[in-house]
């Protein structure tokens, strides 16, 4: 299957690119996604080797680097822990509702690319992220969009 590309959002105060970079083996599971469409992307579509744009959301939304999918979708165990912020009493190990993937740090951009700057790039005019009202935390991007953003960011 051909490589696909994704944008994954995270609040930098919760989990930043530096956190991924500092994980053992620079790898971590992407848990806590509680939107059905984003869940379906992770469960059904993401494959090992797919490229990821790591996006810091919040007060200063910006793309900060890249990662790779290193494990396909599997049940998100945080949904089963009542002490976890992502707990969902309807999800069980026997009937999981939520899924996650594992990603591995790949690169940090020399300069983060703010959302506002992305809006000014003609090659990105159709990007899902830039559509009004889009709040998905995981979304597909085209190879052209991925390559354009990586080129803009430059690797450290």
Where are these regions (language model features)?
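Surface-exposed, flexible loop/turn segments at secondary-structure boundaries
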Residues: 13, 60, 75
